[in-house]
Every structure is written in C-alpha cells, then in structure tokens.
Amino acid sequence: MHLWQRGVDSVKFSPEKRDIDLRCELLGDRPDRKLVGYVGRLANEKRIDDLAALEKRDDIQLVIVGDGPARMRLERELPTAKFVGYQAGEDLAHYYASLDIFVHTGKHETFCQSIQEALASGVPVIAPNSGGPTDLVKHGWTGFLIDTSNSYSLNHSVDQILKLSEPALMADRARNSVIDRTWEIVNNQLLNHYRELKNKQALAESEKVA
C-alpha cells in the first residue's frame, strides 16, 4: 500500500513572496510584533475561535485570511485580529509568506492543503495532533503538533517558535519538508504506482498461463 499525497506549488508559494509593505500595513504602529495567521474557510468546524487564546497577546498580531459563514461571529470574538477576507493567486502567496507563524485549528482534516502552502512559504506551522496535519508537520522540526484548543499549549508553542535563537532554520526546514511535493513529482509517483500494479498483474497472468 502506498500513500499518495497532494502536491503543492512551491514556486507560487515561496519565502520570496514575503512582502514588507504588507507586513507594515498589517502591523500598523507596532512593527515590533510578529504576525500569526490562519488561512482557510471561516466555519464553525474549523475551530478558529481557539485563536482567542492568542488574541490578547501584546507581542503578536493575528491575521485571518478567508471568508465563510462564521466570519461575523469571529470578528466579534476576535476584535483585534485583522480579517482580510478571501485571497487567491499571488495575493494569497504574499499573505502566507509574510506570516511568522501559521496556525491551523481544525481537528478533523483528512489532509490540509493550507498547511502545505504555509510550509512551502517557509512558515513554521502549529496544528492539531490529529488527522491530516500529522502527515505534514514534523513536531519540533517544522512546527508543533498540539491540542490547539488548549490555550496553554497554543501559547507555549508560539513562544517556542518566537524564542528560537535561529528562526530561519525552522523556516528553511519547513520549506524543505515539501520541496519534493510538487504536483509534477506526486503525479509521477502515482503513475509509477499504477505501472507497478500493472506489471504485477501481468506477471500474475503469465504465471497462470505457465
């Protein structure tokens, strides 16, 4: 049995898309803070309200990229967060790369493409230790897998990343962890699996004839 994972566009999503002007716009008169963000659909099952544990921190600015039925409620519950709405294409790539930490809070993901896009952008990831994220994030190496509904664990993980003596190392490891998952590479892997299966079937048929 082989695991076939989705690919990611590592050219579109890249640390090179980090946008100083966008960071200045998001940070306002507090450029000393770090940007911590979520990208995805704003729906109840995504548990974005778990980010309330970070909202009152003075050293970060929360950024919420996306839209959905829970947006109005979340804007009330996270009044200091920056809600920038749905983004796509190059604009989305700039938002990813301009973050210092990406946090995903949904606990029931079969995969999580936004995590791959954040990693490709060279952004450390904090995500639930369940479902799809466990196949993407290497705990302590490219980010942290935790119970994101636990406010202590979430804050502690943010602190660990912000206090890294060489934060660029984790950013590089994040990028390198998905650099071989381009769509071309993963599609070729799938084709190779089909070829292997076809060859095994052909061999089995020839043995029956013999």
Residue ranges and their predicted role:
Residues 1-19, 24, 31:
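Donor nucleotide-sugar binding/catalytic pocket of nucleotide-sugar-dependent glycosyltransferases
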Residues 166-180:
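A short, well-ordered alpha-helix in the C-terminal region of glycosyltransferases
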